[in-house]
A protein has these predicted regions:
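Conserved RNase H-like, two-metal-ion catalytic cores of nucleic-acid enzymes
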Residues: 1-63
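Conserved DEDDh/DEDDy metal-dependent 3′-5′ exonuclease domain
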Residues: 38-129
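Acidic, Mg2+-coordinating catalytic module of metal-dependent nucleases/exonucleases
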Residues: 133-197
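A short secondary-structure junction signal
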Residues: 18, 76-77, 129, 145-146, ...
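Acidic active-site catalytic centers that drive phospho-/nucleotidyl reactions
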Residues: 8-10, 105, 168
Length: 198
C-alpha cells in the first residue's frame, strides 16, 4: 500500500504583519501542521519544534495531497521565500525535485483545469477558496478562517489552532477522496473536471 498523506499548515504570523506579505513564506513560521495518514488512519500534529520531523515525513511519503500546498505550505515548511521557491533556485530546486512527483495539490489542479498557469497568479484565478469548493462539492464547510489562526497562536490558543488545522485537513482528505473517485469538483456552480496530474 502506498504511503498517501494529506497535509495542512497554519502559520505563526499574519500576512499583514509580515514584511513581504504572501511572498515572505520564509518568515511566516509553522504554528501547527496536521498530517492525515491513510495507512494508519491517524492524524499527526506537528508544532514549531517538530518542523524537521514534518519535513522528513513529507519526503518519505509516496503521495502528498492538500490545498495550495505547492505554493504555500511547502515553502512555509521549508522556510523558503515564495519567489525563491517559484524560481527553483538554491536549496528549493532539490526539495522541489523530491516533492513534485508526489504532490497532489487540489488548487493547482483547479487552476490548470481552468487553463491558468498555476505558477503565475492572476486575477481570474480567484474564487477557488477551499470553503467554496468543498462546500459545493462534498457539502463540507470550514469551521473558521485561516487568517485567524496566527492571531489565535499569538494569543496562546494553540489548541484552537490545532482544531482548526485538523478540521481543514479532514476536509482536504474528503475532497481528495471525492476527486480520486469521481474526477471533478464543483466550481462556480459547474462541474470542473480535473487533470490526473499537475
Amino acid at each position: 500500500m502506498s504511503d498517501h498523506i494529506v497535509v495542512d499548515v497554519e502559520i505563526q504570523r499574519t500576512i499583514e504583519e509580515t514584511p513581504g506579505g504572501w511572498d515572505a513564506t520564509d518568515k511566516l513560521g509553522v504554528a501547527v501542521a496536521c498530517v492525515w495518514e491513510y495507512n494508519t488512519q491517524r492524524m499527526r500534529v506537528y508544532g514549531p519544534d517538530d518542523v524537521q520531523a514534518l519535513r522528513e515525513r513529507l519526503l518519505a511519503a509516496d503521495r502528498i495531497s492538500g490545498y495550495n500546498i505547492w505554493n504555500f505550505d511547502f515553502p512555509v515548511i521549508w522556510g523558503i521565500s515564495k519567489p525563491t521557491w517559484m524560481n527553483g533556485s538554491g536549496e528549493s530546486a532539490v526539495i522541489k525535485m523530491d516533492l513534485q512527483p508526489k504532490c497532489n495539490d487540489i488548487l493547482r489542479r483547479i487552476w490548470i483545469a481552468q487553463g491558468f498557469n498555476p505558477d503565475v497568479f492572476s486575477k481570474g484565478m480567484g474564487g477557488a477558496k477551499l470553503d467554496d469548493i468543498a462546500g459545493a462539492t462534498i457539502g463540507a464547510r470550514k469551521i473558521g478562517n485561516g487568517a485567524d489562526a496566527p492571531v489565535w497562536y499569538q494569543q496562546g490558543l494553540v489548541q484552537k489552532v490545532v482544531n482548526y488545522c485538523a478540521d481543514d485537513t479532514c476536509i482536504e482528505r474528503d475532497l481528495t477522496d471525492f476527486i480520486d473517485r469521481y474526477g471533478y469538483v464543483i466550481h462556480q456552480g459547474k462541474q470542473l473536471w480535473l487533470t490526473k496530474k499537475d
